[in-house]
């Protein structure tokens, strides 16, 4: 078998994986719309109440789960290449921390409970603010990628400390709201909130198309520059795109951990490291994972709903450990 045939077979394998994951996402989405306290059968006509339940409650929730999962997974895959660290995720640069901090400050600063739109704008503003702080420090001090990672960790610790102070001084009602949001939830998703997905979608598509530059960055900054990549400009474009996606994700569903870390790493262990295929596959896999997690969050308890962040951690951690053990045994 010649080299050209090997490349062709590899491309077909990636394309087959994309088709399989797309089918899985469609099946999970169908199940997501059907199940709940009221079962909606696709084989019979729906009443007015069932149509309203489907269109106004379940469909917005499905879109939120899929968009958040895709955004976090692609952001994680990009950061892991950009920083050269498999432990990198959207929270590692302090971007998620900035979004959560802004929402907490809005919750306690305003005399009345903020509207969902105010929460969304606050989360996006917080993530962008922390990104601009990061960019300003890095440009002033001419930071390398490794030092950029350390600055992001420091910003994340700072935001976490302030949120902890908010916990300490909050009353019972505010504390419950804050706790539930920090654990991640899309139970209140509505079409009104999905104006933010109009911002997420083009950024997500653009990021999924950056596979070839990221493949060159994996060779190192010097080699990437020799291959025609403006590393400095590309780095900040990617960070700004990630900040928008993460801010919108936090605004829609709170802090949902583990997706950006586990999904790209699992796909690399299973299928390889070509980012031109890995990024769109991460988007589909991340969307499918969060849709599946939300199905479990709604069905596991009869009288209550589990936080989505708890579900993603419960699903992702055992799979991640199993894949690491399998990879080690195969060596």
UniProtKB/Swiss-Prot annotation:
Molecular function terms, GO-annotated: vitamin transmembrane transporter activity
GO CC, alphabetical: plasma membrane
Subcellular location: Cell inner membrane
GO biological process: cobalamin transport
Main localization category: membrane
SUPFAM superfamilies named in the record: ABC transporter involved in vitamin B12 uptake, BtuC (SSF81345)
Annotated keywords: Cell inner membrane, Cell membrane, Membrane, Transmembrane, Transmembrane helix, Transport
Membrane topology per record: Multi-pass membrane protein
Xref: InterPro entries: ABC_BtuC-like (IPR037294), ABC_transptr_BtuC (IPR023691), ABC_transptr_permease_BtuC (IPR000522)
Keyword Transport annotated: yes
The keyword DNA damage belongs to this UniProt entry's keyword annotation: no
A Pfam family the protein falls into: FecCD
Signal peptide: none
Transmembrane segments: 20-42, 62-84, 91-113, 118-140, 147-169, 189-208, 240-262, 277-299, 306-325
Assembly notes: The complex is composed of two ATP-binding proteins (BtuD), two transmembrane proteins (BtuC) and a solute-binding protein (BtuF).
Function: Part of the ABC transporter complex BtuCDF involved in vitamin B12 import. Involved in the translocation of the substrate across the membrane.
Family according to the record: Belongs to the binding-protein-dependent transport system permease family. FecCD subfamily.
The protein, known as: Vitamin B12 import system permease protein BtuC
């Amino acid at each position: 078998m010649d080299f050209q045939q090997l490349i062709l077979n590899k491309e077909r394998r990636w394309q087959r994986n994309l088709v399989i994951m797309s089918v899985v996402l469609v099946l999970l989405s169908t199940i997501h719309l059907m199940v709940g306290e009221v079962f909606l059968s696709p084989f019979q006509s729906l009443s007015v109440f069932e149509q309203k339940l489907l269109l106004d409650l379940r469909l917005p929730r499905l879109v939120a789960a899929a968009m958040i999962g895709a955004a976090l997974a692609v952001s994680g895959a990009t950061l892991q290449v950009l920083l050269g660290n498999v432990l990198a995720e959207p929270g590692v640069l302090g971007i998620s921390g900035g979004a959560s901090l802004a929402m907490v400050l809005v919750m306690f600063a305003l005399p009345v409970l903020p509207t969902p739109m105010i929460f969304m704008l606050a989360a996006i503003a917080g993530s962008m603010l922390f990104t601009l702080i990061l960019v300003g420090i890095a440009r002033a001090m001419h930071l390398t990628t490794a030092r950029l990672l350390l600055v992001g960790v420091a910003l994340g610790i700072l935001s976490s400390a302030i949120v902890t102070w908010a916990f300490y001084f909050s009353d019972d009602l505010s504390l419950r709201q804050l706790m539930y949001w920090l654990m991640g939830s899309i139970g209140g998703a509505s079409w009104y909130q999905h104006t933010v997905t109009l911002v997420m979608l083009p950024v997500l598509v653009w990021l999924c198309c950056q596979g070839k530059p990221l493949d060159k960055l994996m060779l190192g900054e010097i080699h990437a520059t020799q291959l025609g990549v403006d590393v400095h400009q590309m780095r900040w474009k990617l960070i700004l795109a990630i900040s928008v996606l993460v801010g919108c994700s936090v605004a829609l569903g709170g802090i949902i951990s583990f997706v950006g870390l586990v999904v790209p790493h699992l796909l690399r262990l299973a299928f390889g490291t070509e980012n031109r295929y890995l990024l769109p596959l991460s988007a589909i896999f991340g969307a499918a994972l969060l849709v599946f997690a939300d199905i479990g969050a709604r069905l596991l308890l009869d009288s209550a709903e589990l936080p989505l962040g708890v579900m993603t951690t419960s699903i992702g951690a055992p799979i991640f450990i199993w894949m690491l053990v399998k990879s080690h045994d195969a060596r």
